[in-house]
Amino acid sequence: MPTASPRASARSRRADAVSGMPLTLDAALADVAAEIDRQFDQLLAIPDDPRADLYRAMRHAAIGGGKRLRPLLVFATANLFDVARECSARAATALEAIHVYSLIHDDLPSMDNDDMRRGKPTVHKMFDEATAILAGDCLHALAFEVLADPATHADPFVRIELVLDLARAAGPNGMAGGQIMDIEAETTRFDLNTVTRLQQMKTGALISASVEAGAILGRLPPEGRVGLRGYAHDLGLAFQIADDLLDAEGDEAVAGKKLRKDEVAGKETFLSLLGPERAREQARMLVDQAIAHLHSYGKEADLLRDIARFVLERDR
């Protein structure tokens, strides 16, 4: 008897509730994407003054497109602790604002010099370079404005911890530090340990912050977050290996962005250092490890498990 593919089984299974709504993985992805678009639409209303193009640029980058994986991780983790939907939505929007700001700046001529992102022109192509820089700056600021607002959580200590954790994830010991290492990789040969550290910072830090945000909203004490942190760590590395494979083997029309950039730039990646088969094997092992970290949560963590499997199967 033929068996269903892992992709089909993960996506058709009834996953646990996202803020009280029982959803399949596909439905959860769609629901969170719509919620994040709604949040950005409210936060980025276009003013009738000279700042209008700045807001249009932010909306161009932030609304529509993208996997919304980081926001989904916030929702799925917060749901373990019955966090109110609006609290999860605001924290998830802040995480996505940081991610989108990083994409805007990453696409600039001084960085990756990309023309397409999420299937549409990059912000500096649609507007201009100065507007793109400022749009990224504003989304960066917006993230912390949202987290610091009492509407995100009534407890000021929860809000402070959210701000602190995201600041660390986005700064020189996280995403920005990983980005400068990625630039150095164009002229310096990195070994596997250095590439792993680079990707833990550039990609993994924000994925970890997304899971951490859900735990913070749920007021889970730090000593209770060991399993979730292990899940996020392994998921982040698996995500990057899958991204390296997608960059080398994917379809640009489906991915909505330019591919094979790392090979052209001569950068060492998990794929170049391990080869395709070992890289796939490593990604599968990391996903299995990530799922194992969730053993204490039972069926309530099925959505997080499905997200881990989805990371290996995505095509964009």
Task: Mark where each language-model region is.
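N-terminal amphipathic/basic leader segments beginning at the initiator methionine
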Residues: 2-44
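Local alpha-helix boundary/kink/capping signal
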Residues: 8-12, 77, 296
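Mg2+-dependent prenyl diphosphate-binding active-site environment of isoprenoid biosynthetic enzymes
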Residues: 31-35, 44, 48-292, 299-312
